[in-house]
């Protein structure tokens, strides 16, 4: 070892344990445009000051460990350490704080969501000094955004591929999600697409089970969508779930989908993992496939308000990793989703530039520069009576997906699809004429039902179905 190295490492080194805040709490720090910024909801253990808790988060998610180490002298901690630069008390909550942490960009591998999340949320969430910890938001700097491909195609390219403009896209998840044979599954796909839907979908847990192997499903679904296209003159798609037990098997399924000439494949990005997802997204761009993303397992991570990771972070991570659609909740259906919070992360998915807006849960201004946008997918417990609200909430750049709300129609699958298409066209027409969908929605649906027996039957079946439960995740006061 050289004398210079020995001198650098030994000068000022003192073994032992010292408070994190002495090194990692820096309220005077001015954040840089190249820093990744994080907002953590911190609940310290009794007796732990908030400054120490915030500094511990910064340390344990960057360069720190529980004791001083000799090798600290071999690098520049000031260059590489995370810094807790601000602490806010959460109004209305006992012993909860928002700790803002800045991370130098050099801590992260270029183009790797996997590495970014491993660093920021990898170990620190099990830290004993904290009762609970939640990552509320991230600011991804432009310098880091530009190292990612992002969505394979984006909203405008998808519309051009489908030749569909001026309205939300319509989809349907095939039910029952498990148990159908491949041929009966394909039959349901055909009936729904023939009836007027743009897409049908594999459910998240449809992979390759004994009752329906993936290759058989792909073949029958391809036959169904090409037949429906020929009959309707519209471009159709079915989300063929390529999720598999290995990346190699996943890619084999995606390649087969491309060889069949189908326009879109699907991936469960959280259970499948970010490395697999980014690999698939790159393949989809190179080979002209759209990529639908399901967020299965998200509520395990994001539903509790004081611990875990907010979905807006998972949404940003998905936009970086790559996907053309992602499920986003419905606000009005059976799944968790408060309106302002949902609209906040929907904007983070679709827009190029999003201003900080705490009223919608957005902690940082985010500039995506040229990264393509992602279509939010509203799915889960929705039916024709929800159509005005969904059109008003999500606007044109969205996918409205009715599973039971299509296949549960009393006359069958194709009439269920007709009912949804008529309801959507009526709502878009009324909106374009200046009518208030939020106030006049039920009247608009009733008027359309006079001319569509399929819609009238759907209205009768689901007239009393509501899901009135308070959201678990709400904005701070």
UniProtKB/Swiss-Prot annotation:
Pfam families: RuBisCO_large (PF00016), RuBisCO_large_N (PF02788). Its cofactor is Mg(2+). The modification N6,N6,N6-trimethyllysine is found at residue 14. Substrate binds at residues 123, 173, 177, 295, 327, 379. It is found in: Plastid, Chloroplast. Mg(2+) binds at residues 201, 203-204. Residues 1-2 form a propeptide. The record marks 334 as: Transition state stabilizer. Binds 1 Mg(2+) ion per subunit. GO terms for biological process: photorespiration; reductive pentose-phosphate cycle. PROSITE patterns: RUBISCO_LARGE. InterPro entries: RuBisCO, RuBisCo_large_chain_AS, RuBisCO_lsu_C, RuBisCO_lsu_C_sf, RuBisCO_lsu_fd_N, RuBisCO_lsu_N_sf, RuBisCO_lsuI. CDD domains: RuBisCO_large_I. The modification N-acetylproline is found at residue 3. Its EC number is 4.1.1.39. It catalyses: 2 (2R)-3-phosphoglycerate + 2 H(+) = D-ribulose 1,5-bisphosphate + CO2 + H2O; D-ribulose 1,5-bisphosphate + O2 = 2-phosphoglycolate + (2R)-3-phosphoglycerate + 2 H(+). The disulfide bond which can form in the large chain dimeric partners within the hexadecamer appears to be associated with oxidative stress and protein turnover. RuBisCO catalyzes two reactions: the carboxylation of D-ribulose 1,5-bisphosphate, the primary event in carbon dioxide fixation, as well as the oxidative fragmentation of the pentose substrate in the photorespiration process. Both reactions occur simultaneously and in competition at the same active site. The basic functional RuBisCO is composed of a large chain homodimer in a 'head-to-tail' conformation. In form I RuBisCO this homodimer is arranged in a barrel-like tetramer with the small subunits forming a tetrameric 'cap' on each end of the 'barrel'. Belongs to the RuBisCO large chain family. Type I subfamily. NCBIfam families: PRK04208.1 (NF003252). This is Ribulose bisphosphate carboxylase large chain. The lineage of its organism: Eukaryota, Viridiplantae, Streptophyta, Embryophyta, Tracheophyta. The gene is rbcL.
């Amino acid at each position: 070892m050289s004398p210079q190295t020995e001198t650098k490492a030994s000068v000022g080194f003192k073994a032992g344990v010292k408070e994190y805040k002495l090194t990692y709490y820096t309220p005077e720090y001015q954040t840089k445009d190249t820093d990744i910024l994080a907002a953590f909801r911190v609940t310290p253990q009794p007796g732990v000051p908030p400054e120490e808790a915030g500094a511990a988060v910064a340390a344990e998610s960057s360069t720190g460990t529980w004791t001083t180490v000799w090798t600290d002298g071999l690098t520049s901690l000031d260059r590489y350490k995370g810094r807790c630069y601000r602490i806010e008390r959460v109004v209305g909550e006992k012993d909860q704080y928002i700790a803002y942490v800045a991370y130098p960009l050099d801590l992260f591998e270029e183009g790797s969501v996997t590495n970014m999340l491993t660093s920021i949320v990898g170990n620190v969430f099990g830290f004993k000094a904290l009762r609970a910890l939640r990552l509320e938001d991230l600011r991804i700097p432009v310098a880091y955004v530009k190292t990612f491909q992002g969505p394979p195609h984006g909203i405008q390219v998808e519309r051009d591929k489908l030749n569909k403009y001026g309205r939300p896209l319509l989809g349907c998840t095939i039910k029952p999600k498990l148990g159908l044979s491949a041929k009966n599954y394909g039959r349901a796909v055909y009936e729904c697409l023939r009836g007027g839907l743009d897409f049908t979908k594999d459910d998240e847990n449809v992979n390759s089970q004994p009752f329906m192997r993936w290759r058989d499903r792909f073949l029958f679904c391809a036959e169904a969508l090409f037949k429906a296209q020929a009959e309707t003159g519209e471009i159709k798609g079915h989300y063929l779930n390529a999720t598999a037990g290995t990346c190699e098997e996943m890619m084999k399924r995606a390649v087969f989908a491309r060889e069949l000439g189908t326009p879109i494949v699907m991936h469960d990005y959280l259970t499948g993992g970010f490395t697999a997802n980014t690999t698939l997204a790159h393949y989809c761009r190179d080979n002209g496939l759209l990529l639908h993303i399901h967020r299965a397992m998200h509520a395990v991570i994001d539903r509790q308000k004081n611990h875990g990771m907010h979905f807006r972070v998972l949404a940003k991570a998905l936009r970086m990793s790559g996907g053309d659609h992602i499920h986003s909740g419905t606000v009005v259906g059976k799944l968790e989703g408060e309106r302002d919070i949902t609209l906040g992360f929907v904007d983070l998915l679709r827009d190029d530039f999003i201003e900080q807006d705490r009223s919608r849960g957005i902690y940082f201004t985010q500039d995506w520069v040229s990264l393509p946008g992602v279509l939010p997918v509203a799915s889960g417990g929705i039916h024709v009576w929800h159509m005005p609200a969904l059109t008003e909430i999500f606007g044109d750049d969205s996918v409205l997906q009715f599973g039971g709300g299509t296949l549960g129609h009393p006359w069958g699958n194709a009439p269920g699809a007709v009912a949804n298409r008529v309801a959507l066209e009526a709502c878009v027409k009324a909106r374009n004429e200046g009518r208030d969908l939020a106030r006049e929605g039920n009247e608009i649906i009733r008027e359309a039902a006079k001319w569509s027996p399929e819609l009238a039957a759907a209205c009768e079946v689901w007239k009393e179905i509501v899901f009135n439960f308070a959201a678990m995740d709400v904005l701070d006061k």
